[in-house]
């Protein structure tokens, strides 16, 4: 992951890395690198979740007066000219003042394919990953921060829906390419049907099922068509999990537990999964 730092530093004015509960041994190379490369390192004593880590990074930028933030997961890599292309696309957008989140084209490094974003009528993505997004810091003052009680999974989906519900837009920069991978995809088959499950952990299956349900309940009457499409995509992805992955018993248990907690609104970090 340290190799992802120089390409980002070459394109931004400042960089902050938020660590979620790594051991002293794991942190040592990051502590050394931040002194060499001149970036900030926020060290959380425990895993507070991706949403809280993103919020910490955004607050760090806001306190320093930065008008924009560029957000990344730990396993995403940017290409040359990424940020310049982002700003070019934003400036040439038909309504730049309403654009609350700029997104790249995604190239899956595990599968060697480019991800296709479902587009809304305005030409922007309906939802998109937070990783790789360029966002003006004013949007967080307008509609709030990322939902820390989600902990992980669907944090980006919920925020994209919140952006659109508030009347703002998402847009794509076609010349900005983000290299990433989702889960640990491996090809599988069932009754002669070949497919590629993501092989997310059993822990993630809990948060995925819970948070998806919470998002659907909140936005089904605001964006019914988009939510129904997301539900369909989620059902296909979940079916691939239970037909082609290992540890299906525990994953099914966590899926059902997440569904139950989503129905009753139990949020936050869940222990003993």
Which residues does each predicted region cover?
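A short, conserved alpha-helix in the catalytic core of glycosyltransferases
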Residues: 139, 143-144, 149-182
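Short, well-formed alpha-helical segments that are part of the catalytic scaffolds
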Residues: 1-9
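A recurrent flexible, glycine/aromatic-enriched loop bordering the glycosyltransferase active site
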Residues: 118-135, 197-200
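Short beta-strand-to-loop acidic/aromatic patch adjacent to the donor-nucleotide binding site
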Residues: 66-77
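Glycine-rich, basic loop-to-helix element that forms the pyrophosphate-binding segment
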Residues: 44-61
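Non-catalytic, C-terminal membrane-associated alpha-helical segments of glycosyltransferases
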Residues: 217-273
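A conserved acidic beta->alpha catalytic loop
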Residues: 19-28, 46, 76-77
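Conserved donor NDP-sugar-binding/catalytic core segment of glycosyltransferases
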Residues: 81-114
